[in-house]
Amino acid sequence: MKILFVAAEVSPLAKVGGMGDVVGSLPKVLHQLGHDVRVFMPYYGFIGDKIDVPKEPVWKGEAMFQQFAVYQSYLPDTKIPLYLFGHPAFDSRRIYGGDDEAWRFTFFSNGAAEFAWNHWKPEIIHCHDWHTGMIPVWMHQSPDIATVFTIHNLAYQGPWRGLLETMTWCPWYMQGDNVMAAAIQFANRVTTVSPTYAQQIQTPAYGEKLEGLLSYLSGNLVGILNGIDTEIYNPAEDRFISNVFDADSLDKRVKNKIAIQEETGLEINRNAMVVGIVARLVEQKGIDLVIQILDRFMSYTDSQLIILGTGDRHYETQLWQMASRFPGRMAVQLLHNDALSRRVYAGADVFLMPSRFEPCGLSQLMAMRYGCIPIVRRTGGLVDTVSFYDPINEAGTGYCFDRYEPLDCFTAMVRAWEGFRFKADWQKLQQRAMRADFSWYRSAGEYIKVYKGVVGKPEELSPMEEEKIAELTASYR
């Protein structure tokens, strides 16, 4: 099938959150499975620093009375065509923000639709989050191009209302409306990034005022679990960590622990449990819970803590102040750095992710891949990816708690600290976590079923596709 991915983020070229990881990795697996997959994204001002882009465009067009040009390159280290939407509106070195954000992404979406109509015509356009939400609306009347719309985070629906009401070209049913709601209504199929989140967003607690629409259209909604790029996130070959290792050589992992302690200014202590957090420092990620229990946990245990990320200023300030109270035991790095995050996964003993809500979450998958045991609140994709640790039956992959309460989070962390002292059992837990299959292969098969369905084919994999997916999965393991 011919599939065009359209998104505001594509890792490793432009990434703010998990959507970039998905759009940067899922096309690779679909390509391996024999599909003609291409990617369409804005030509941000920093893209030319990362890949070679020809000076001459492959196509020029017009959208919203503006001229634009499309340049072709390739996703790094692949043969997957990458189309870059060029216009001065995207020349800055930022992805999001600014008063013109709604206009920029409406223009980008319109340009992607024009490109699909007039240059490279796919069978399916796979749209990602609100930035591309107008594409299903415009494509709804197109008989030979279907759309799939993926909700990565329902909380971010786009600053659209005032803008759309001023656009005379906007369809009548969009006047004063929510563009994500329109995408949900007009896409041929809607997906989200985990089965549990697909159920949760049909309830008032998680539906962000769209639960009625999502519940009404639940037959058109499917949750497909995200995966990670297991070639990039591979502790046996990762050039960004101090010492490579795998599930059968965990004795080498302690060198990464010592290295991350040195790098972040912690005391060198291989016996202290190192807790890692790599996250946006916002309420969604449970940072308020962390702040409430941190003094008590650090006083009760001899653990160390590394926090990596940026976010709300008041959280950054509080965490920075708390770090000063625990010199040598707590490090706060207020930045986004993929290489450093991998060193945290490779060196920390546990990974704390107490999210208020979590559509899927990728950090816990990356952590497990590196033998870093997750402590999670059971919500969204965290339910689908982390199972309760049972040392008696030697089952499970992490520590979980249900209620969004400080005491519950504290208790789970103390249980992990106590379990960490039993080294033989802990190593078995690490091996189970590292060997869990969070590659894209099975999930890619579920997307293929969705793609077949929207073009009128039976939603099932052929024996050849089943065999290929099984072969790729076996090679990963």
Swiss-Prot record:
GO terms for molecular function: alpha-1,4-glucan glucosyltransferase (ADP-glucose donor) activity; alpha-1,4-glucan glucosyltransferase (UDP-glucose donor) activity. ADP-alpha-D-glucose binds at K15. One of its GO terms (biological process) is glycogen biosynthetic process. Keywords: Glycogen biosynthesis, Glycosyltransferase, Transferase. It is an enzyme of class 2 (transferase). It catalyses: [(1->4)-alpha-D-glucosyl](n) + ADP-alpha-D-glucose = [(1->4)-alpha-D-glucosyl](n+1) + ADP + H(+). Synthesizes alpha-1,4-glucan chains using ADP-glucose. This is Glycogen synthase 1. It comes from Synechocystis sp. (strain ATCC 27184 / PCC 6803 / Kazusa).
